[in-house]
Protein backbone atom coordinates (compact mmCIF):
# COMPACT_ATOMS: atom_id res chain seq x y z
CA UNK A 1 0.00 0.00 0.00
CA UNK A 2 1.38 3.39 -0.98
CA UNK A 3 2.15 6.15 1.50
CA UNK A 4 1.21 9.74 0.70
CA UNK A 5 3.74 12.42 1.56
CA UNK A 6 2.94 16.13 1.42
CA UNK A 7 5.89 18.23 0.25
CA UNK A 8 5.81 21.80 1.54
CA UNK A 9 8.96 23.48 0.25
CA UNK A 10 8.18 26.94 1.63
CA UNK A 11 10.61 29.83 1.37
CA UNK A 12 14.30 30.66 0.95
CA UNK A 13 16.38 27.52 0.55
CA UNK A 14 13.29 25.38 1.16
CA UNK A 15 12.73 24.42 -2.51
CA UNK A 16 16.42 23.51 -2.95
CA UNK A 17 16.66 21.19 0.03
CA UNK A 18 13.27 19.59 -0.62
CA UNK A 19 14.44 18.82 -4.17
CA UNK A 20 17.28 16.74 -2.70
CA UNK A 21 14.89 14.95 -0.36
CA UNK A 22 12.73 14.08 -3.38
CA UNK A 23 15.77 12.39 -4.96
CA UNK A 24 16.11 10.28 -1.83
CA UNK A 25 12.41 9.45 -1.76
CA UNK A 26 12.62 8.36 -5.40
CA UNK A 27 15.54 6.09 -4.54
CA UNK A 28 13.55 4.68 -1.64
CA UNK A 29 10.80 3.79 -4.09
CA UNK A 30 13.23 2.12 -6.49
CA UNK A 31 15.63 0.49 -4.03
CA UNK A 32 13.98 0.55 -0.63
CA UNK A 33 10.76 -1.37 -1.15
CA UNK A 34 8.68 1.67 -0.21
CA UNK A 35 5.82 2.90 -2.39
CA UNK A 36 5.37 6.64 -1.90
CA UNK A 37 3.12 9.18 -3.57
CA UNK A 38 4.39 12.77 -3.44
CA UNK A 39 2.17 15.84 -3.65
CA UNK A 40 3.30 19.45 -3.25
CA UNK A 41 1.60 22.39 -1.57
CA UNK A 42 2.27 26.05 -0.78
CA UNK A 43 3.09 27.31 2.70
CA UNK A 44 4.63 30.36 4.32
CA UNK A 45 5.64 33.42 2.36
CA UNK A 46 5.37 31.57 -0.95
CA UNK A 47 1.73 30.81 -0.14
CA UNK A 48 1.05 34.37 0.99
CA UNK A 49 2.31 35.80 -2.30
CA UNK A 50 -0.11 33.63 -4.27
CA UNK A 51 -3.14 33.34 -1.99
CA UNK A 52 -2.83 36.09 0.63
CA UNK A 53 -2.54 33.55 3.45
CA UNK A 54 0.45 31.53 4.75
CA UNK A 55 -1.68 28.39 5.03
CA UNK A 56 -4.17 27.98 2.17
CA UNK A 57 -7.12 25.66 2.71
CA UNK A 58 -5.79 23.40 -0.05
CA UNK A 59 -2.48 22.95 1.76
CA UNK A 60 -4.16 22.15 5.06
CA UNK A 61 -6.42 19.61 3.33
CA UNK A 62 -3.36 18.03 1.71
CA UNK A 63 -1.60 17.79 5.07
CA UNK A 64 -4.65 16.24 6.72
CA UNK A 65 -4.91 13.66 3.93
CA UNK A 66 -1.24 12.62 4.02
CA UNK A 67 0.61 9.98 6.00
CA UNK A 68 3.47 12.40 6.62
CA UNK A 69 4.52 15.95 5.79
CA UNK A 70 7.99 17.09 4.74
CA UNK A 71 8.60 20.81 5.23
CA UNK A 72 11.49 22.88 3.90
CA UNK A 73 11.51 26.21 5.71
CA UNK A 74 9.33 29.30 6.08
CA UNK A 75 10.00 32.99 6.50
CA UNK A 76 12.11 35.80 5.13
CA UNK A 77 12.80 39.50 5.69
CA UNK A 78 10.35 40.62 3.01
CA UNK A 79 7.44 39.39 5.13
CA UNK A 80 8.56 40.63 8.55
CA UNK A 81 6.43 43.79 8.34
CA UNK A 82 3.20 41.92 7.61
CA UNK A 83 0.45 41.69 10.19
CA UNK A 84 1.43 38.89 12.56
CA UNK A 85 -1.69 36.92 11.56
CA UNK A 86 -0.42 36.42 8.00
CA UNK A 87 3.31 36.10 8.53
CA UNK A 88 4.88 32.93 7.06
CA UNK A 89 5.44 31.33 10.46
CA UNK A 90 1.69 31.28 11.06
CA UNK A 91 1.40 28.65 8.34
CA UNK A 92 3.65 26.34 10.30
CA UNK A 93 1.82 26.99 13.56
CA UNK A 94 -1.51 26.46 11.81
CA UNK A 95 -0.57 22.98 10.62
CA UNK A 96 0.75 22.02 14.04
CA UNK A 97 -2.49 23.12 15.65
CA UNK A 98 -4.87 21.63 13.07
CA UNK A 99 -3.13 18.26 13.08
CA UNK A 100 -2.58 18.12 16.84
CA UNK A 101 1.19 17.78 16.52
CA UNK A 102 2.04 17.89 20.21
CA UNK A 103 5.37 16.04 20.38
CA UNK A 104 8.50 17.64 18.94
CA UNK A 105 11.52 15.36 18.59
CA UNK A 106 14.91 17.02 18.18
CA UNK A 107 17.90 14.66 18.02
CA UNK A 108 21.36 16.10 18.60
CA UNK A 109 23.88 13.73 17.07
CA UNK A 110 27.52 14.55 16.45
CA UNK A 111 28.85 12.61 13.50
CA UNK A 112 32.44 11.52 14.20
CA UNK A 113 33.56 13.06 10.90
CA UNK A 114 32.42 16.49 12.17
CA UNK A 115 33.72 16.40 15.73
CA UNK A 116 36.09 19.25 14.95
CA UNK A 117 33.16 21.50 13.99
CA UNK A 118 31.82 21.63 17.54
CA UNK A 119 32.86 24.56 19.70
CA UNK A 120 33.40 22.16 22.61
CA UNK A 121 36.41 19.92 23.15
CA UNK A 122 36.27 16.57 21.31
CA UNK A 123 36.45 14.62 24.57
CA UNK A 124 33.31 16.43 25.78
CA UNK A 125 31.14 15.91 22.68
CA UNK A 126 32.58 12.92 20.82
CA UNK A 127 29.89 10.26 20.55
CA UNK A 128 27.06 12.66 21.44
CA UNK A 129 23.62 11.20 20.70
CA UNK A 130 20.70 12.65 22.63
CA UNK A 131 17.03 13.23 21.91
CA UNK A 132 15.05 16.21 23.18
CA UNK A 133 11.30 15.61 23.39
CA UNK A 134 9.51 18.95 23.60
CA UNK A 135 5.82 19.42 24.36
CA UNK A 136 4.64 21.55 21.45
CA UNK A 137 1.03 22.67 21.85
CA UNK A 138 0.67 23.70 25.50
CA UNK A 139 2.45 25.77 28.08
CA UNK A 140 3.16 29.47 28.18
CA UNK A 141 3.12 29.91 24.39
CA UNK A 142 -0.57 29.06 24.27
CA UNK A 143 -1.88 29.76 27.78
CA UNK A 144 -4.67 32.26 28.39
CA UNK A 145 -5.02 35.01 29.45
CA UNK A 146 -2.21 36.76 27.63
CA UNK A 147 -1.60 40.23 26.27
CA UNK A 148 -0.56 43.76 27.10
CA UNK A 149 -2.74 46.08 29.16
CA UNK A 150 -2.44 49.55 30.61
CA UNK A 151 -2.63 49.88 34.37
CA UNK A 152 -4.62 52.56 36.20
CA UNK A 153 -1.64 54.89 36.49
CA UNK A 154 -0.84 54.52 32.78
CA UNK A 155 2.03 52.05 32.89
CA UNK A 156 1.86 49.17 30.42
CA UNK A 157 1.98 45.56 31.63
CA UNK A 158 2.58 42.43 29.60
CA UNK A 159 1.40 39.04 30.79
CA UNK A 160 1.37 35.39 29.75
CA UNK A 161 0.01 32.29 31.45
CA UNK A 162 1.80 28.97 31.95
CA UNK A 163 -0.83 26.23 31.93
CA UNK A 164 -0.52 22.45 31.60
CA UNK A 165 -3.26 19.87 31.96
CA UNK A 166 -2.39 16.49 33.40
CA UNK A 167 -3.41 14.80 30.14
CA UNK A 168 -1.00 16.99 28.14
CA UNK A 169 1.88 16.08 30.42
CA UNK A 170 1.00 12.39 30.44
CA UNK A 171 0.92 12.01 26.66
CA UNK A 172 4.29 13.73 26.10
CA UNK A 173 5.76 11.60 28.90
CA UNK A 174 4.56 8.44 27.17
CA UNK A 175 6.24 9.55 23.94
CA UNK A 176 9.52 10.18 25.74
CA UNK A 177 9.52 6.88 27.62
CA UNK A 178 8.56 4.92 24.51
CA UNK A 179 11.48 6.45 22.62
CA UNK A 180 13.82 5.76 25.54
CA UNK A 181 12.87 2.07 25.42
CA UNK A 182 14.52 1.90 21.98
CA UNK A 183 17.61 3.83 23.11
CA UNK A 184 19.65 3.74 26.33
CA UNK A 185 16.53 3.65 28.57
CA UNK A 186 17.17 6.89 30.42
CA UNK A 187 14.82 9.88 30.61
CA UNK A 188 15.67 13.23 32.17
CA UNK A 189 12.61 15.40 32.80
CA UNK A 190 13.46 19.11 32.86
CA UNK A 191 11.27 21.55 34.80
CA UNK A 192 11.37 24.43 37.26
CA UNK A 193 9.31 22.75 39.95
CA UNK A 194 10.93 24.76 42.73
CA UNK A 195 9.19 27.97 41.62
CA UNK A 196 6.52 27.09 39.02
CA UNK A 197 3.45 25.18 40.19
CA UNK A 198 2.61 24.06 36.65
CA UNK A 199 5.93 22.26 36.43
CA UNK A 200 5.49 20.85 39.91
CA UNK A 201 2.52 19.01 38.40
CA UNK A 202 4.75 18.18 35.43
CA UNK A 203 7.22 16.45 37.75
CA UNK A 204 4.48 14.52 39.56
CA UNK A 205 2.94 13.21 36.33
CA UNK A 206 6.34 12.27 34.90
CA UNK A 207 6.98 10.15 37.97
CA UNK A 208 3.57 8.50 37.62
CA UNK A 209 4.22 7.59 33.98
CA UNK A 210 7.68 6.30 34.88
CA UNK A 211 6.00 3.61 36.95
CA UNK A 212 4.56 2.24 33.70
CA UNK A 213 8.09 1.87 32.29
CA UNK A 214 10.11 0.15 35.02
CA UNK A 215 12.94 -0.59 32.56
CA UNK A 216 13.56 3.14 32.07
CA UNK A 217 15.50 5.24 34.58
CA UNK A 218 13.88 8.62 35.29
CA UNK A 219 15.73 11.64 36.64
CA UNK A 220 14.58 15.22 37.21
CA UNK A 221 16.57 18.38 36.61
CA UNK A 222 15.83 22.09 36.93
CA UNK A 223 16.07 23.90 33.61
CA UNK A 224 18.88 26.24 34.66
CA UNK A 225 21.02 23.27 35.68
CA UNK A 226 20.06 21.41 32.49
CA UNK A 227 21.32 24.30 30.35
CA UNK A 228 24.62 24.22 32.23
CA UNK A 229 24.93 20.43 32.01
CA UNK A 230 24.29 20.45 28.25
CA UNK A 231 27.47 22.47 27.87
CA UNK A 232 29.47 20.86 30.68
CA UNK A 233 28.75 17.17 30.04
CA UNK A 234 26.15 16.64 27.30
CA UNK A 235 26.78 12.90 26.93
CA UNK A 236 25.15 12.28 30.32
CA UNK A 237 21.76 12.67 28.60
CA UNK A 238 19.84 10.08 26.60
CA UNK A 239 16.25 11.38 26.27
CA UNK A 240 15.34 14.81 27.64
CA UNK A 241 11.63 15.64 27.98
CA UNK A 242 10.46 19.12 28.81
CA UNK A 243 7.89 21.87 28.38
CA UNK A 244 7.26 23.95 25.30
CA UNK A 245 9.34 26.98 26.23
CA UNK A 246 12.14 25.10 27.98
CA UNK A 247 12.36 22.71 25.03
CA UNK A 248 12.48 25.60 22.59
CA UNK A 249 15.55 26.97 24.35
CA UNK A 250 17.36 23.74 25.25
CA UNK A 251 16.96 22.16 21.80
CA UNK A 252 18.69 25.13 20.16
CA UNK A 253 21.44 24.91 22.77
CA UNK A 254 21.87 21.18 22.08
CA UNK A 255 21.86 21.79 18.34
CA UNK A 256 25.00 23.89 18.49
CA UNK A 257 26.89 21.13 20.30
CA UNK A 258 26.97 19.33 16.95
CA UNK A 259 28.78 22.11 15.10
CA UNK A 260 26.19 22.81 12.40
CA UNK A 261 22.43 23.15 12.44
CA UNK A 262 22.61 22.11 8.79
CA UNK A 263 22.88 18.51 10.01
CA UNK A 264 19.91 18.35 12.36
CA UNK A 265 16.41 17.05 11.58
CA UNK A 266 13.22 17.24 13.62
CA UNK A 267 9.80 15.64 13.86
CA UNK A 268 6.46 16.83 15.21
CA UNK A 269 4.05 13.98 15.91
CA UNK A 270 0.38 13.52 16.71
CA UNK A 271 -1.15 10.85 18.93
CA UNK A 272 -1.19 8.25 16.13
CA UNK A 273 2.37 8.81 14.91
CA UNK A 274 1.54 10.90 11.87
CA UNK A 275 4.02 13.72 11.70
CA UNK A 276 5.57 16.73 10.07
CA UNK A 277 9.31 16.52 9.44
CA UNK A 278 11.65 19.42 8.84
CA UNK A 279 15.26 20.55 9.26
CA UNK A 280 15.74 22.77 12.29
CA UNK A 281 17.54 25.48 10.35
CA UNK A 282 15.68 28.43 8.91
CA UNK A 283 14.98 29.56 5.37
CA UNK A 284 18.45 31.18 5.02
CA UNK A 285 17.38 33.73 2.39
CA UNK A 286 20.95 35.07 2.23
CA UNK A 287 22.13 31.90 0.46
CA UNK A 288 18.94 30.94 -1.39
CA UNK A 289 19.45 30.15 -5.05
CA UNK A 290 23.22 29.76 -4.77
CA UNK A 291 23.28 25.97 -4.62
CA UNK A 292 25.30 25.89 -1.40
CA UNK A 293 22.64 24.98 1.18
CA UNK A 294 23.23 21.81 3.20
CA UNK A 295 20.47 19.28 2.39
CA UNK A 296 21.56 16.70 4.98
CA UNK A 297 19.22 17.89 7.75
CA UNK A 298 16.29 17.53 5.34
CA UNK A 299 17.48 14.11 4.20
CA UNK A 300 17.85 13.03 7.83
CA UNK A 301 14.32 14.34 8.40
CA UNK A 302 13.25 11.81 5.77
CA UNK A 303 14.99 9.15 7.87
CA UNK A 304 12.98 10.25 10.91
CA UNK A 305 9.83 10.09 8.78
CA UNK A 306 10.64 6.52 7.82
CA UNK A 307 11.17 5.58 11.46
CA UNK A 308 8.24 7.29 13.15
CA UNK A 309 5.46 7.65 10.55
CA UNK A 310 6.08 5.18 7.72
CA UNK A 311 6.98 2.10 9.79
CA UNK A 312 10.27 1.58 7.95
CA UNK A 313 12.97 1.67 10.65
CA UNK A 314 15.37 -0.48 8.63
CA UNK A 315 15.27 1.96 5.72
CA UNK A 316 15.71 4.85 8.17
CA UNK A 317 18.91 3.28 9.49
CA UNK A 318 20.05 2.57 5.95
CA UNK A 319 19.59 6.22 4.98
CA UNK A 320 21.43 7.44 8.07
CA UNK A 321 24.32 5.11 7.22
CA UNK A 322 24.35 6.56 3.70
CA UNK A 323 24.77 10.06 5.13
CA UNK A 324 27.65 8.80 7.26
CA UNK A 325 29.24 7.19 4.20
CA UNK A 326 29.11 10.48 2.29
CA UNK A 327 30.79 12.27 5.19
CA UNK A 328 33.43 9.51 5.21
CA UNK A 329 34.12 10.40 1.57
CA UNK A 330 35.02 13.90 2.71
CA UNK A 331 32.18 15.65 0.90
CA UNK A 332 31.04 18.87 2.56
CA UNK A 333 28.74 21.78 1.84
CA UNK A 334 30.24 25.16 2.82
CA UNK A 335 28.69 25.22 6.30
CA UNK A 336 30.57 22.08 7.36
CA UNK A 337 33.64 22.47 5.16
CA UNK A 338 37.10 22.22 6.69
CA UNK A 339 40.58 22.08 5.14
CA UNK A 340 41.28 18.67 3.64
CA UNK A 341 37.67 17.99 2.68
CA UNK A 342 35.91 18.52 -0.65
CA UNK A 343 33.36 21.31 -0.99
CA UNK A 344 30.29 20.34 -3.02
CA UNK A 345 26.99 21.90 -4.03
CA UNK A 346 23.55 21.16 -2.64
CA UNK A 347 22.72 18.98 -5.63
CA UNK A 348 26.02 17.10 -5.56
CA UNK A 349 25.54 16.30 -1.89
CA UNK A 350 22.05 14.96 -2.56
CA UNK A 351 23.32 12.85 -5.46
CA UNK A 352 26.09 11.43 -3.29
CA UNK A 353 23.64 10.40 -0.58
CA UNK A 354 21.41 8.67 -3.14
CA UNK A 355 24.40 6.80 -4.55
CA UNK A 356 25.54 5.75 -1.07
CA UNK A 357 22.00 4.68 -0.16
CA UNK A 358 21.77 2.45 -3.21
CA UNK A 359 25.01 0.71 -2.22
CA UNK A 360 24.19 0.45 1.49
CA UNK A 361 22.73 -2.95 2.45
CA UNK A 362 19.06 -2.74 3.49
Swiss-Prot record:
NAD(+) binds at residues 76-89, 282-294. Pathway: Amino-acid biosynthesis; L-leucine biosynthesis; L-leucine from 3-methyl-2-oxobutanoate: step 3/4. Mg(2+) binds at residues 224, 248, 252. Gene3D superfamilies: Isopropylmalate Dehydrogenase (3.40.718.10). Its EC number is 1.1.1.85. GO terms for biological process: L-leucine biosynthetic process. One of its GO terms (molecular function) is 3-isopropylmalate dehydrogenase activity. Pfam families: Iso_dh. It is found in: Cytoplasm. Keywords: Amino-acid biosynthesis, Branched-chain amino acid biosynthesis, Cytoplasm, Leucine biosynthesis, Magnesium, Manganese, Metal-binding, NAD, Oxidoreductase. Catalyzes the oxidation of 3-carboxy-2-hydroxy-4-methylpentanoate (3-isopropylmalate) to 3-carboxy-4-methyl-2-oxopentanoate. The product decarboxylates to 4-methyl-2 oxopentanoate. Homodimer. This is 3-isopropylmalate dehydrogenase. The lineage of its organism: Bacteria, Pseudomonadati, Pseudomonadota, Gammaproteobacteria, Chromatiales.
Amino acid sequence: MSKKIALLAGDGIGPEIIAEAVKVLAALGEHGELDVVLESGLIGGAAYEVTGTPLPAETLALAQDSDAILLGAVGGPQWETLDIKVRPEKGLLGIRSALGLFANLRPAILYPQLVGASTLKPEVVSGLDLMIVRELTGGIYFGQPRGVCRLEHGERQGFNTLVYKESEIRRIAQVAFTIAMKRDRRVCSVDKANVLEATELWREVMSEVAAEFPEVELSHMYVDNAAMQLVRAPKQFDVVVTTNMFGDILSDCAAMLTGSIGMLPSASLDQSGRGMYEPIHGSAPDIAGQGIANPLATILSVAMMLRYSLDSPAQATRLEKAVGAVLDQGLRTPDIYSPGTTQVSTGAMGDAVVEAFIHTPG
